[in-house]
Design a protein with these regions (language model features):
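Active-/binding-site microenvironments in catalytic and ligand-binding cores
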Residues: 1-178
Length: 178
């Protein structure tokens, strides 16, 4: 637990708050304890702190107290849906016109997908139809981990940015991504 001129922070022994990562915005919510309730405004993973999740708080909390966290579930669920939709759309764009996704924004009211090249209208319409087909097919979403050595066996859209154990997400037989 610490504070500086920019804000108040806490690293917990366990957390369900998702840190901003992989194009998905961080969770928000509250921490409750003997001090009352404080807002969790943001969460991020701190590599210098061995991958701990840092919770950015609206007010300081005492060190060493037990807390209970509650995430803003409607926000989290919306981001989960958008993130999965982004996987479907990126794969559909790749299949429809060879369009490669380079960046996404999921946090605003309007989500955006940036492509390496400009997409033609026919390619976008085909991608939309493919993505809708995947939604209606109700493919299962499965997450699993593989070692770096095992990665070569999986046909990924792009190489992962992480090393060591890599988390893969498979959406039926439609998409597989790190």
């Amino acid at each position: 637990v610490w504070s500086d001129e920019k804000g108040h922070y806490a690293v917990l022994s366990q957390t369900l708050f998702y840190p901003e990562s992989g194009g998905q915005p961080a969770d928000r919510g509250v921490l409750r304890g003997p001090f009352g309730e404080v807002q969790v405004l943001h969460a991020y993973e701190e590599e210098k702190a061995f991958g701990d999740v840092v919770h950015v708080l609206s007010a300081p909390i005492p060190e060493g107290v037990e807390v209970e966290g509650e995430i803003d579930w409607p926000r989290r669920f919306r981001h989960m849906q958008r993130h999965t939709a982004r996987h479907l759309l990126s794969q559909a764009l790749l299949r429809a016109g060879g369009y490669h996704t380079v960046a996404v924004s999921l946090d605003s009211p309007v989500c955006t997908v940036d492509l390496e090249e400009e997409a033609e209208e026919a390619g976008v319409l085909e991608a939309e139809a493919l993505a809708n087909f995947a939604v209606y097919a109700d493919y299962p979403v499965e997450a699993f981990y593989v070692s770096e050595e095992e990665l070569a066996r999986y046909p990924l859209r792009r190489p992962p940015k992480v090393r060591g154990k890599v988390r893969l997400v498979r959406i039926g037989d439609f998409d597989l991504a790190a």
